[in-house]
């Protein structure tokens, strides 16, 4: 495992730019934020909006193996079943996301034939129910259904609306029709329920309702019968099950959903009026009810409580078709009225002169009005009037010779009688991605009116609309859509858009989600260094960086190359939030622990502030170019503001490739499961099938790079033009390697059964930067192979992407990894010795891969589970004694390869033991021989003798010793022993010693010593000659003797005659003691 304080030992051999790791990394300087996983490409299709996710405090062990990649994702909106695809190289597997993982609406959840994004919405037309109108009307419609979707209209289900007054069920039904699936359910209440006050539950009674009681409404969906009708269930069938809260075990009824509540009043509903003041004396009461052709609308003329007027003239004008049919005096004993009415063909006019007694203002209640007249307006049957018709009012006072301003009132004429209007939208949520992309996001809207008989009329052309807060959401001029354009400053839950038609007003509630700013930029490595030994071609105008200063000038290859810089992966994350309507707190779409990957949305708006320092490639890979500090930015598409910023440092330091992890990929498998904490998030696991199970089955390899600074990156993020790879087989009987013309990666082909580190991957620099004198190999890695042939079965042929055959143990490991709650501090990565098996598992499960690397057709692949020999390890798993699969793996027999390895190990151990015995015997014999040499006069014996002297004649005539070829000889140098006398030589002689150790025995090296002795009296020069001699082994088996012997030490002339050790006798004693020690 490697982390912030981890320290690992490494032994590496570097020869000619080749790095072959022998262990694990030493003293990692930093921890990469990018774990080592299978670098598969994941793609979601058939989804209108979907996001990959990152979980806060995510378990690092979830992605800790080169064999698999685990990614959570979220489907925000989809009409058809989404499909997730995982691919790597030529292998691909896809899976349809099942409906149970999408958490679709419970109303349509049991009906698979409808789109996933359909939701049933309800709108109660009038929440106040009176005894004179004992009818509850609710409009149902389908969100997510297009206005023009007519394919599924014939299969739309029925809706049942029901309530439980006085412990009895009252129900009504309707069938969804057309697009977007509209119907109105009408629930009729019995008269006795109003008189009894509706004996409802105590908690449902609200005293503030002034005598009214609440009644809860519910609905459920069920299919229509063969005739297309919606018959209701038998009376009382639901009573004992739903009202009592019990559920019948014998029969499962459709799930019910709550609609809302209505208030039931025992009184009659009064007409609704609107007051219009003509001046401080006269007030007109305008009815708000719709008027159809042939009907009459009554207007009331009253005096205010403070009025003292007793005579005035009222002038009225109306459009043609609106006629004054009657004028009635409310108090004939108090007021008299003279009428002048003209119901002409072009205009209706009337003059009403009112005279009465002076009113008694003290007898009126404060704030009340004194009614004088009732004026009836009738609608002509042949007028074809529709909409609001204006009526003008003006009052004059003859005595005072004054006149009021002209006041306009309206009467609403309709061909039909509306009871309310309802705005319909295709969705009740808006995801404001316009802030990120600059592209507006809109939701179509329609407005329909519901008549008394339950029929629905489209009134979209004659409505008015206005947003309650345009900083959250806007509405189009013709009221046919609501939209966001990226200029909004806020987001909100249940923000309101008002729609008005005639005198009806309806509010549409919509939730707007917006990205939380600033965005978060995640870079796997924010410190990029040069990679030692990896040279890439550079442009002619850029000065190349030399790897070393001692390169020969005649080397033309590589002269236009510079060192490669490290690469890092980049992604942009954010959270979608909305403010709560009451407290103003933030509400998260998936919760505060989730971040959405929005890199694809902002790729074209990402840039590096200093492109000469670093460069973005495809918006997801950051490559260093030259040392410096710069920032990666996400710019706003609508302004010059910066939405996100991250600092990156490109260093002049050099790192080496410490490890090259290799993973065999013979196919792909894919599994899905809900997240343990939030069921709306789905966790996908894409795994590599690494067991070759049929002869000539093909596979490719995947590789990761571990650098000496601790960062890890997949090799795939580097440009293929900057490197080349060579894959070779270490056992041609098990696997062979074939060249692939369509890809840079060679193909591994199964030949026979076996397993182990049998493939070797060599990574080399590109051809333009190769040097002629040495092969620039950057790193070598070994990958593990497992070939186990199994008999094919016809029932597994076909190429369907079945994931049921994924190894059970691997699935359990991934499940445990996802379900893990804690222990984050120990979840760090492990890098093991190359080729060292981390486990050996047998596989019995099966899977298929749809495509082969060369032929591009379906082949049978059976899953072998996790690789038993991964170069970078999978997360370790302890055997569970309660798990039968673990017991099976533990108790299996040894394979032929394992038996051979154990036998070879025993032979090695035996050889080592014999070697140790020989060493002991040799040491014992050598000890006796040394004692024998000492008894013969302390004649020193050494392999390194040095002859020193100042007689020119002696030095210029080296001794020629010729040995018979049949005699046993050993090479020594005549002279003093090197280990004790090397301090007598000058420095230049010492430097050449290491080169002389590898010279042959007949090689004579001469060098003049230029230093003069301290007592030199002339220009005579000292000369030193190194000569190799031999020691002759006596025929009688006695002790070794030298081929050239000297009588005494007096014949030796030393280079340094005075060592400061005292007189000559002391020096001789010192030398004799050293010889005795040898």
From Swiss-Prot:
Chain residue ranges for the region called Disordered: 834-887
GO cellular component, one term: membrane
Signal peptide as annotated in the record: none
Compositional bias annotation for Polar residues: 841-852
Extracellular topological domain residue ranges: 1-903
Membrane spanning residue stretches: 904-924
Membrane side Cytoplasmic: residue ranges: 925-1078
Compartment annotation: Membrane
Cross-referenced InterPro entries: Ig_TMEM132_2nd, Ig_TMEM132_5th, Ig_TMEM132_6th, TMEM132, TMEM132_3rd, TMEM132_C, TMEM132_M, TMEM132_N
Annotated glycosylation sites: 343, 366, 381
Keyword Transmembrane: yes
Membrane topology according to the record: Single-pass type I membrane protein
Keyword field contains Kinase: no
Similarity comment text for this entry: Belongs to the TMEM132 family.
PANTHER family: DETONATOR, ISOFORM E, TRANSMEMBRANE PROTEIN 132B
Protein's name according to its UniProt entry: Transmembrane protein 132B
Native species: Homo sapiens
Originating gene: TMEM132B
């Amino acid at each position: 495992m490697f982390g912030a304080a981890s320290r690992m030992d490494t032994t590496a051999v570097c020869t000619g730019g080749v790095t072959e790791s022998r262990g694990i990394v030493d003293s990692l300087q930093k921890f990469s934020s990018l774990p080592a996983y299978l670098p598969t490409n994941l793609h979601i299709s058939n989804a209108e909006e979907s996001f990959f996710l990152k979980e806060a405090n995510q378990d690092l062990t979830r992605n800790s193996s080169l064999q698999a990649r685990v990614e959570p994702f979220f489907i925000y909106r989809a009409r058809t079943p989404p499909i997730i695809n995982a691919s790597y190289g030529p292998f691909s597997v896809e899976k349809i996301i099942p409906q149970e993982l999408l958490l679709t609406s419970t109303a349509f959840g049991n009906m698979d034939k409808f789109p996933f994004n359909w939701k049933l919405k309800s709108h109660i037309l009038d929440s106040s129910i009176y005894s004179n109108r004992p009818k509850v009307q609710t409009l149902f419609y389908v969100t997510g259904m297009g206005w023009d979707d007519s394919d599924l209209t014939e299969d739309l289900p029925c809706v049942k609306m029901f309530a439980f007054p006085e412990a009895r069920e009252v129900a009504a039904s309707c069938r969804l029709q057309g697009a977007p699936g509209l119907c109105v359910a009408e629930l009729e209440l019995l008269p006795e329920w109003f008189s009894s006050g509706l004996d409802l539950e105590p908690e449902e009674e609200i005293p503030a309702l002034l005598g009214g009681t609440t009644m809860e409404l519910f609905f459920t969906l069920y299919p229509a019968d063969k005739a297309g009708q919606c018959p209701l269930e038998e009376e009382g069938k639901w009573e004992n099950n739903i009202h009592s809260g019990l559920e019948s075990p014998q029969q499962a009824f459709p799930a019910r959903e709550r609609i809302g509540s209505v208030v039931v009043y025992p009184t009659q509903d009064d007409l609704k009026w609107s007051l219009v003041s003509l001046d401080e004396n006269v007030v007109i009461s305008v009815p708000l009810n719709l008027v159809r052709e042939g009907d009459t609308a009554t207007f009331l003329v009253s005096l205010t409580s403070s009025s003292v007027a007793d005579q005035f003239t009222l002038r009225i004008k109306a459009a043609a078709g609106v006629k004054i049919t009657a004028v009635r005096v409310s108090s004939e004993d108090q007021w008299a009225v003279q009428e002048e009415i003209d119901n002409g063909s072009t205009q209706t006019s009337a003059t009403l002169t009112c005279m009465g007694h002076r009113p008694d203002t003290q007898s009126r209640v404060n704030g009340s009005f004194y009614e004088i007249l009732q004026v009836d307006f009738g609608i002509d049957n042949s007028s074809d009037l529709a909409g609001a018709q204006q009526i003008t009012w003006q009052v004059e006072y003859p005595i005072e010779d004054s006149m009021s301003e002209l006041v306009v009132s309206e009467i609403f004429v309709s061909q039909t009688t509306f009871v309310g209007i309802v705005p319909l939208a295709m969705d009740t949520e808006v995801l404001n991605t316009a802030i990120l992309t600059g592209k507006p996001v809109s939701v179509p809207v329609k407005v329909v009116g519901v008549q008394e008989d339950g029929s629905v009329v489209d009134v979209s052309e004659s409505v008015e609309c206005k947003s309650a807060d345009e900083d959250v959401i806007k509405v189009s001029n013709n009221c046919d859509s609501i939209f966001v354009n990226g200029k909004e400053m806020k987001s909100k839950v249940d923000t309101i858009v008002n729609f008005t038609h005639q005198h009806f007003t309806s509010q549409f509630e919509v939730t707007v989600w917006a990205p939380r700013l600033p965005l978060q930029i995640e870079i796997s490595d924010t410190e990029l260094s040069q990679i030692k030994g990896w040279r890439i071609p550079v442009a002619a105008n850029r000065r190349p960086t030399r790897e070393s200063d001692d390169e020969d000038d005649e080397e033309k290859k590589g002269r236009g190359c510079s060192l490669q810089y490290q690469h890092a992966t980049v992604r942009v994350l954010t959270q979608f939030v909305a403010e709560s309507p009451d407290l103003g707190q933030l509400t998260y779409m998936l919760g505060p622990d989730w971040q959405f990957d929005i890199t694809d949305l902002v790729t074209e708006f990402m840039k590096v502030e200093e492109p000469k320092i670093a460069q973005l490639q495809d918006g997801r890979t950051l490559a260093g170019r030259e040392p410096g500090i710069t920032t990666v930015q996400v710019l706003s598409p609508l302004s010059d503001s910066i939405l996100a910023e991250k600092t990156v440092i490109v260093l002049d330091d050099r790192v080496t490739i410490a490890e090259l992890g290799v993973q065999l990929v013979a196919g792909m498998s894919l599994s899905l499961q809900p997240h343990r904490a939030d069921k709306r998030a789905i966790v996908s696991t894409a795994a590599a099938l690494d067991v070759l199970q049929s002869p000539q089955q093909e596979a490719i390899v995947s590789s990761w790079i571990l650098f000496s600074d601790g960062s890890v990156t997949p090799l795939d993020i580097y440009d293929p033009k900057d490197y080349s790879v060579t894959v070779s087989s270490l056992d041609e009987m098990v696997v062979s390697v074939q060249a692939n013309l369509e890809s840079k990666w060679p193909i591994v082909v199964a030949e026979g059964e076996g397993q182990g580190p049998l493939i070797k991957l060599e990574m080399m620099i590109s051809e333009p930067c190769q040097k002629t004198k040495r092969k620039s190999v950057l790193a070598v890695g070994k990958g593990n192979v497992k070939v186990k042939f199994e008999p094919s079965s016809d029932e597994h042929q076909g190429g369907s992407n079945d994931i049921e055959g994924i190894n059970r143990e691997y699935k359990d490991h991934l499940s445990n990894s996802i379900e893990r709650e804690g222990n984050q501090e120990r979840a760090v990565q492990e890098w093991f010795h190359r080729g060292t098996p981390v486990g050996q598992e047998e596989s019995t499960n099966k899977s298929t891969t749809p495509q082969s690397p060369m032929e591009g057709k379906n082949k049978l692949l059976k899953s072998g589970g996790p690789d038993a020999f991964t170069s970078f390890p999978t997360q370790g798993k302890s055997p569970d004694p309660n798990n039968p699969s673990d017991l099976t793996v533990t108790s299996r027999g040894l394979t032929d390869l394992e038996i051979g390895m154990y036998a070879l190990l025993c032979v090695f151990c035996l050889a080592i033991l014999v070697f140790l015995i020989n060493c002991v015997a040799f040491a014992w014999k050598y000890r006796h021989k040394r004692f024998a040499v000492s008894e013969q006069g302390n004649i020193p014996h050494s392999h390194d003798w040095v002859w020193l002297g100042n007689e020119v004649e002696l030095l210029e005539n080296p001794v020629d010793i010729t040995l018979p070829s049949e005699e046993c000889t050993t090479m020594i140098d005549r002279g003093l022993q090197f280990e004790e006398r090397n301090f007598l030589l000058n420095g230049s002689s010492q430097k050449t010693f290491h080169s002389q150790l590898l010279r042959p025995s007949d090689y004579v090296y001469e060098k003049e010593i230029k230093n003069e002795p301290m007592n030199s009296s002339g220009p005579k020069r000292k000369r030193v000659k190194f000569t190799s001699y031999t020691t002759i082994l006596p025929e009688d088996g006695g002790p070794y003797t030298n081929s050239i012997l000297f009588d005494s030490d007096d014949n030796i002339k030393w280079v340094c005659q005075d060592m400061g050790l005292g007189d000559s006798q002391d020096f001789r004693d010192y030398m004799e003691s050293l010889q005795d020690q040898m």
